[in-house]
From Swiss-Prot:
Name assigned to this protein: Isopentenyl-diphosphate Delta-isomerase
Lineage: Bacteria, Pseudomonadati, Pseudomonadota, Alphaproteobacteria, Rhodobacterales
Location of this chain's protein in the cell: Cytoplasm
Pfam families hit by this protein: NUDIX
Source species: Cereibacter sphaeroides (strain ATCC 17025 / ATH 2.4.3)
Signal peptide: none
EC number(s) given by UniProt: 5.3.3.2
Protein family membership: Belongs to the IPP isomerase type 1 family.
Amino acid sequence: MPEMVPAWVDGRLMPVEKLEAHQRGLRHKAISVFVMAGESVLIQRRAAGKYHTPGLWANTCCTHPRWGEAAADCAVRRLREELGITGLVTVFADQVEYRADVGSGLIEHEVVDIFVAEAPQDLPVAPDPEEVWETRWVDLHDLAREVEEHPERFTPWLRIYLADHMERIFGKLRVVQ
């Protein structure tokens, strides 16, 4: 059964098959999570088998909520499914909208609810190899520099978050600690 995501069609929010939303460049809902340990962020390299942006580095996890699923529930679900992470408190940080070509004729036009969570760097992580190639902790400012110097290694959305929305996302995190 195809995965149905919330997308806007003719101004109405309705369930649309995920691949169709990307093929048509429809504006759709998404979530992104950043797990932080102080000034370090856990990032993941997307699995080679992903249908877009395979092998590129992204934030801790990101996905689309299922039709009828709350964004906060989706964030917790994907931390568990992609990385085996449970028990973290995710806090809504901001909402960002962007549109980006992700290759192979696919467009991400997302309205993204962004969540942050604090964790120790020794947090147990068990990546699902279908989703995640590898993970690493990196200082947030080092990551921003790395993205600027080697943008081809990173997903379009991570580049956008760090270039255009870093203070909006991570400034609020410092208040949460």
